[in-house]
Amino acid sequence: MTESIQLSQFEFIRASGPDARTFLQGQVTCDTTQITPTQSVLGALCNLKGRVIADFRAAQVGEDIVLKVGTGLAEPVLAVLKKYAVFSKLTLSKDDELAVLGLLVRGKGEDDAQSDTLPSGPHAVTSLGEGVLAIDAGCSDEGTRCVELWGNGPSIEASAALQTSSDARTPNKTVAVATISDWTRLEILSGVIHITPALSEEYTPAQLNYDISGVVNFKKGCYTGQEIVARMFYRSTPKKRLYPLHAEIPLASDAELNDSASETTIKPLAIAGNAMLALLDTDPLAREITLASEASVKLAVKEPDYFTK
């Protein structure tokens, strides 16, 4: 079964021109040479102090490089990038024509032939035609994986209708619909945190696990904030890491935690459904962590798969 979600929490930046790829290579944490028509990458833009302004997914759309960022961050990111783009042959702009729709692919049955058209490798990209890209989001849990569809509104809705049909040749007239909370919950359980305007320039890559989850490439050359990010990775051991937690009950949007290792309550960075992401002292699996408002509600800590890579 496949369900679709309008992911209105994202917007797009387009970099066009002969210098687009090389310019971005000198500004962001990912290796832009790894972006191909069949492969996207995750990355971040940092400030001079090594704090994350925005995270993004970068993909090749035609001859351009397109960045998907959190809603409200396209303009701040453009303002930073344009300061350094004066002598480069490229155009940087917010792309209001592109939209993103999420697919929750729940298992695979005998009649799910359409899922064979979707990418299966981490962050892989396939073209579905009509200008629509399908991108593996790198998130999965409990037999469900996340796939992004990029394109203009009517095109991605038509592609979603085809993907959610039990017959790959006949689109559903009524598309099975999930919610943004369903999508975010799977991201949280996979240890994925996205920067919002409220989180922008507040955290280092290490605090968000970007240094171990593939958002930062330590083999590429210099970029803004690189010296600080690299020093923290190679010369220090984080005292805190971002951990997914989940409860047996739905969590309030303002829920806070009590951790036996901390003297103060902890405010999570993201909450959806019964799951949350919170910065905890390392090695929390053996500690008791409860809701601050209801000590009888215990939360289970999960280590993301990238912890063991």
What are these regions (language model features)?
Residues 1-55, 59-62:
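Acidic, proline/glycine-enriched N-terminal capping motif
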Residues 208-215, 230-309:
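Glycine-rich, small/acidic residue-mixed loop/short-helix segments
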Residues 41-55, 85-86, 126-135, 229, ...:
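Short amphipathic beta-strand starts and helix->beta connectors
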Residues 3-5, 11-14, 57-167, 171-190:
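Acidic, low-complexity central loop/insert segments
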Residues 25-33, 75, 79-87, 234:
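Short, intrinsically disordered, mixed-charge
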